[in-house]
Design a protein with these regions (language model features):
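A generic alpha-helix structural signal
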Residues: 24-28, 73, 120, 124-127
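Beta-strand/loop substructures that line and gate deep hydrophobic ligand-binding cavities in soluble
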Residues: 86-110
C-alpha cells in the first residue's frame, strides 16, 4: 500500500499512463467488461470550476456489482458507507494517479469474514489492468 500526501494510509495509489479523462473512460470500459456497472462519476474538478474555483483534475468513479456487494451490506450494514467501491482518478502534477481504499482496510474496518472480504478484492487486479501493470 502507498500512503498519499498527508499521510492517508490504507490506500493504494498507482500511476496511470493516460490522462484523467482517458483513465476514467478506460476504467468504465473495464468495469463493464467484467460484468459490473458504473453507478456514478463524481467530477470534483468540474464542479469546482462551475462555481469559479480551481481544483486539479479530480474524479471519483463509483462502481460494483449488486451480486457481490449486497451480501457484504446484508452482513455488515455499515459497509454501505464504503460501497459501491470507489476509485479516485486524479492529476498529481501532470501524472495521472489512481487511488482506492485497500480491500484489506475495508475488511478490517468492518470486521468482514474472509468469504465476504474476497468480494472486494477484485479492485486490485482491475486497477492493475487499468494502469497496465
Amino acid at each position: 500500500m502507498t500512503a498519499l500526501r498527508g499521510g492517508v494510509t490504507g490506500t493504494v495509489t498507482k500511476a496511470s499512463p493516460g490522462s484523467v479523462e482517458e483513465t476514467v473512460a478506460r476504467l468504465a470500459d473495464l468495469v463493464a467488461a467484467r460484468g459490473m456497472q458504473v453507478f456514478a462519476v463524481v467530477d470534483h474538478s468540474g464542479e469546482a470550476a462551475r462555481v469559479g474555483l480551481e481544483l486539479r483534475d479530480t474524479k471519483v468513479i463509483l462502481f460494483g456489482s449488486p451480486a457481490a456487494g449486497t451480501p457484504v451490506m446484508a452482513a455488515v450494514p455499515l459497509s454501505a458507507l464504503e460501497l459501491p467501491l470507489k476509485v479516485l482518478v486524479w492529476d498529481d502534477d501532470g501524472q495521472t494517479k489512481v487511488t482506492y481504499t485497500a480491500p484489506e482496510t475495508l475488511a478490517e474496518r468492518f470486521g468482514l469474514p474472509l468469504e465476504l472480504a474476497g468480494r472486494l478484492a477484485g479492485i486490485g487486479p482491475l486497477t492493475d489492468d487499468l494502469v497496465g501493470t
